[in-house]
């Protein structure tokens, strides 16, 4: 568990800047923000997306000035539920549940609500009307990526599909894939595979090697999570099939950008939100609840389509340049009441 506290009021007074006056205008309990404790309880943490998400959570917590505790269950569902109970026992004011399984999180989330704690869920359906769901608009992520696949390859192709059921964002992306296949009967899905075993990319690469060997006629791989796409690309490269197979994915990171921009790369497009921005929105949504405001049952962060051609044309090499050259990617005007301080840009 990581513990951190930001003494915003003391820093503002020492620096003699107007931040302290701004903080005084914040609603309770943020008029004494350093006394507010929130917890981030994570199910998934491996990979660039989750590191960036955590960075966004930390930056927004810093901007508000709250005490953030981070619990990482490392894909242990029972441990994640226990960590919610640990956060309750610590007397936190709010909890962000990041990913997880509905069956293990449903009762744990309800225990937190029963204890008077405000709860927000990101990409896990805890089936609780009192808990807002922060989403990346996963159906739109899948739709944008698949529209690119259809534009590049037509509506008749042989496809491989990477999917692990039971994870809310992947399930929502799967709904879109099922719909696209139904609307385009010329799409022939010959293989579905996937794993969340760590390291995810290497584990998926092992599966993809076997899939490509058994199905050398595959021309499109839909891998709607960037760690899946990394694994598929490893296998495609090793099989010498970069000219034959095109990969379409969801999510993005600096490492992904580098792989997409490799000469002749098979990774053609990804649809993504900025994971750091999603982390910021998660904290802001929780802060609104704590201030007695209603962020809505569903808080949606809109995605952007990022193509290999776009990255090359704009010479984008990392996430910082992506945000600078695509401003819509750098910030989401979501959960931003007037009193809410934002991280420095």
Describe the residue ranges of each PLM region:
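Absolute protein N-terminus
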Residues: 1-2, 96
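A residue-level marker of the well-folded mature domains of exported/periplasmic proteins
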Residues: 23-345
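N-terminal export leaders
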Residues: 4-8
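N-terminal signal peptide c-region/cleavage motif recognized by signal peptidases
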Residues: 18-20
């Amino acid at each position: 568990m990581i513990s951190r506290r930001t003494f915003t009021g003391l820093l503002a007074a020492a620096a003699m800047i107007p931040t302290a006056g701004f903080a005084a205008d914040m609603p309770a309990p943020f008029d004494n923000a350093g006394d507010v404790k929130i917890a981030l309880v994570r199910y998934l943490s491996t990979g660039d997306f989750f590191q960036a998400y955590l960075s966004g959570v930390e930056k927004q917590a810093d901007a508000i000035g709250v005490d953030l505790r981070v619990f990482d269950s490392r894909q242990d569902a029972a441990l994640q539920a226990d960590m919610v109970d640990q956060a309750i026992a610590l007397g936190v004011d709010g909890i962000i549940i990041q990913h997880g399984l509905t069956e293990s999180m449903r009762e744990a989330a309800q225990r937190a609500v029963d204890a008077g704690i405000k709860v927000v869920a990101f990409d896990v359906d805890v089936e609780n009307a009192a808990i807002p769901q922060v989403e990346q608009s996963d159906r739109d992520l899948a739709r944008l990526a698949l529209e690119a696949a259809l534009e590049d390859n037509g509506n008749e192709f042989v496809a491989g599909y990477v999917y692990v059921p039971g994870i809310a964002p992947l399930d929502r992306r799967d709904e879109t894939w099922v719909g696209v296949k139904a609307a385009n009967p010329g799409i022939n899905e010959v293989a579905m595979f996937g794993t969340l075993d760590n390291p995810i990319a290497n584990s998926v690469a092992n599966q993809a090697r076997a899939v490509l060997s058994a199905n050398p006629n595959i021309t499109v791989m839909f891998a709607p999570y960037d760690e899946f796409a990394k694994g598929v690309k490893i296998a495609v490269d090793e099989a010498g099939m970069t000219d034959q197979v095109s990969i379409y994915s969801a999510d993005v990171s600096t490492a992904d950008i580098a792989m997409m921009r490799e000469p002749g790369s098979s990774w053609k497009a990804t649809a993504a939100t900025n994971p750091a921005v999603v982390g910021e929105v998660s904290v802001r949504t929780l802060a609104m609840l704590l201030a007695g405001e209603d962020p809505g049952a569903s808080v949606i962060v809109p995605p952007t389509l990022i193509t290999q051609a776009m990255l090359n044309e704009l010479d984008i090499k990392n996430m910082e340049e992506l945000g600078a050259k695509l401003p819509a990617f750098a910030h989401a005007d979501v959960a931003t009441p007037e009193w809410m301080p934002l991280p420095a840009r």
